[in-house]
Amino acid sequence: SIMNKRFLSKKVQWITAIFITHLMFIVTCLDVLAHNPHDPVLGLGISPNFVNDKTLFVATYGELTDWSYPDIMRSTNGGLTWTRLPNGMDNRGKFSSIRVSPNFSSDNTVFVTTLGTGPGVYKSTNRGNSWQPFNTGLLNRHVTELKIARSGATDYVLFLAPGGGELYRSSSTQANWSIVLEPSSAMISVIAVSPDFMQDSTVIVARTTGNLLISTDGGTQWNDKGIPAGAIIYDITIAPGN
């Protein structure tokens, strides 16, 4: 009948409108997700010469959005566009931090740390174009924190905390890691290196219990300052000249 034809026509129009609306929503979402990096950023590394080279590195966690695997990305135009840098990362796991050498302009070196069953540390000496595991001597490869500081005109020192409460040290002149704080039931939650490390060799670490440990000889000897009353330490910054 005429009434049935009109009803069917309106029903088809209604279904078509719903389909187009959903299609537009999907396309819009794809456009949004196409802007990389769109995943949660777990680490940020900035070139010390950013003013001139506009170079940034980010570590993303794509598994949270089910869109991609964890990635290391680089931008050389201040973040306008990004390039994935997976070459050599056979077992990426979940990234925890990314650090750029203080001598990046000359040594092109970048470090990335991983959690879980990954290699612990990846190192690149060509601005992220390729990576190699850097974990000789590293017994615990669940790395939660890594800090880097200039230790000479062309040298740097690295301090690394895995999940077992110990602290490791390495440097630009070493190919391995060595323990400078023994394992403990209290994990290391924060590492801070002095901005004047070349002069004062100062490193401060905080444990999950609140204990502060200070070294003024680059991590060889440590002074436990105890637990600040009622303190939960989330971060430490050392002022220049102190």
What does each model-found stretch correspond to?
Residues 7, 14-25, 29-242:
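Extracellular glycan-interacting surfaces
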